[in-house]
């Protein structure tokens, strides 16, 4: 909770600075001179409220959504020795990372994958695919679990949601400025907002949202290196490298993780060229090399 409060305070400061900057550069006067009567401060606050509301709501229901979308079965009472080992391993890693033990689950998927989610590092969920349990060695599975525990301990789910909230705020803000400008200056709408405002705003939100997603994905990729580093500390560098190498050998297996969980899985598939800017995970080769440099 403290992380959320501190991050929200930081982002409120960003919104305040943005408002002051627009005023200092005379943006309000520029808009008024062109016939656009728009209170930018009120608009910025409105966009911040709705931008963060959607992001934080998604965060608070993330565990429930993850279970529903992946078919994850929570292990409350282990029925097999593999489930017993899984619970014991997560319990040990959580203790070493200084967090409360998360819920542990298995989801039915042939692909080798795992994810962590939850609004609080002491109220999280870690789940692994059936395919990963069947084909990976115990050391490799432990390293994957350590990576996911690293996400939880670092508070990555909260931070990523709040970064998304900032992005949402400014996408909504600038899309509405563009919509008002086109409506008032180009189409000369005098009373209220014309159809041009709504069409332009929707189009601008789509374009700006697409471009802004590259910022969120850049942050997500940085976050993966930190989780790999945490995994190496908890399970050993050799085991973490081995798990990533094993994932690399399975890159031909389609990744069917729901879009809402892709950023929280250990394996997100492979994209090349400009599409790489919109990847939630760095290439496995870069992650392996970073761990080797770590020593």
Curated annotation (Swiss-Prot):
For the biological process aspect of GO, one term held by this record is: proteolysis
**Which EC numbers characterise this protein's activity in its record?**
3.4.24.-
The record lists the organism as Pseudomonas syringae pv. syringae (strain B728a)
Q: How does it sit in the membrane?
A: Multi-pass membrane protein
Annotated localization: Cell inner membrane
Protein name (record): Protease HtpX
Family the UniProt entry places it in: Belongs to the peptidase M48B family.
Q: What sections of the protein cross the membrane? A: 4-24, 42-62, 158-178, 199-219
Question: Keywords assigned by UniProt?
Answer: Cell inner membrane, Cell membrane, Hydrolase, Membrane, Metal-binding, Metalloprotease, Protease, Transmembrane, Transmembrane helix, Zinc
* Cofactor binding, note field: Binds 1 zinc ion per subunit.
Report the enzyme's class at the first EC level. hydrolase
GO function term, MF aspect, one: metalloendopeptidase activity
Q: Which InterPro entries match?
A: HtpX_protease (IPR050083), Pept_M48_protease_HtpX (IPR022919), Peptidase_M48 (IPR001915)
Q: Which residues bind Zn(2+)?
A: 147, 151, 224
Q: Which GO terms describe its cellular component?
A: plasma membrane
- Write down the CDD domains for this protein, in alphabetical order: M48B_HtpX_like
Q: Which cofactor does it need?
A: Zn(2+)
The active site consists of: 148
Listed Pfam families: Peptidase_M48
HAMAP family listed in its UniProt record: Pept_M48_protease_HtpX
